């Protein structure tokens, strides 16, 4: 590692630890030095839509990707890079390592957690499943590797409906974890026999139907897109329900110029890049 890059990394650590404000020119210089180091180390950054917009742009500049958790891991498997810097919560790093065991997977911190993951303890969930041995166990990607190991199927929000419909066609009764709202949405959409684990996303669980109704009154021409981790009362008011990637596609293709978005604020950054003419 050359001296300039080493100094830049030390500066970046100091900025992060002490929350020191930086000028735009300093930020560009730091970014370029870190990108040079990443090229030396054959590393790319993969990050989730929910992280800060500056980090999303950095990931793209590194030759990496901004995506949902599954696409992050799939990209990691396909890329020629030897090291994956996964910017997201812990289960995303685990998923990337599962799909690319031969690659080095680095995360900025292992303390970045997801309430769905934390709210589904592997030991407790295993006991829950053992009480219902006749049921097929389906878990959401937003779980630890230990929880995934107890499951028959692992799904993402983009493929969950298709998988549940298939299992229903076989006559399966299902245990779904960890998100009770997503599980409720799947049960209502497919009519499958689903027993839900009592978990929720702390971000989406805060969305309230009455607040959404007030927004719709203020902006009646706006389309409403929400994530299926939202409460049922919010989902019922939406024009479109889908995964983060599907929400972006909907916004790009919609005739509506104004969109009310029901998910983490980080997704707005990519939506504005893909559909800058919309609000």
Segments and roles (model prediction):
Residues 1-279:
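Active-site loop-to-helix "anion-binding N-cap" substructures in soluble metabolic enzymes
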């Amino acid at each position: 590692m050359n001296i300039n890059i080493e100094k830049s990394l030390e500066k970046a650590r100091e900025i992060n630890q002490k929350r020191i404000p930086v000028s735009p020119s300093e930020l560009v210089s730091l970014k370029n030095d870190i990108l040079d180091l990443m090229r030396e180390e054959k590393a790319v950054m993969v990050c989730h839509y929910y992280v800060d917009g500056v980090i999303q742009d950095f990931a793209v500049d590194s030759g990496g990707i901004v995506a949902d958790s599954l696409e992050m891991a799939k990209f990691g498997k396909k890329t020629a890079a030897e090291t994956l810097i996964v910017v997201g919560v812990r289960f995303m790093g685990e998923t990337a390592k599962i799909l690319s065991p031969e690659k080095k997977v680095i995360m900025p911190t292992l303390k970045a957690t997801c309430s769905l993951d934390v709210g589904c303890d592997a030991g407790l969930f295993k006991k829950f499943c053992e009480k219902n041995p006749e049921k097929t166990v389906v878990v959401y990607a937003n779980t630890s590797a230990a929880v995934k190991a107890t499951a028959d199927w692992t799904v993402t929000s983009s493929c969950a409906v298709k998988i549940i419909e298939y299992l229903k066609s076989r006559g399966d009764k299902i245990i779904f974890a960890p998100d009770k709202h997503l599980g409720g949405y799947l049960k209502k959409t497919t009519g499958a026999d689903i027993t839900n684990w009592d978990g929720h996303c702390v971000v989406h669980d805060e969305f309230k139907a009455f607040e959404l109704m007030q927004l719709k009154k203020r902006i009646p021409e706006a389309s409403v897109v929400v994530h299926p981790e939202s409460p049922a009362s919010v989902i019922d008011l939406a024009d479109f329900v889908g995964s983060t990637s599907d929400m972006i596609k909907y916004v790009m293709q919609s005739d509506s110029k104004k969109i009310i978005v029901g998910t983490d604020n980080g997704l707005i950054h990519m939506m504005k890049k893909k559909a800058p003419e919309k609000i």
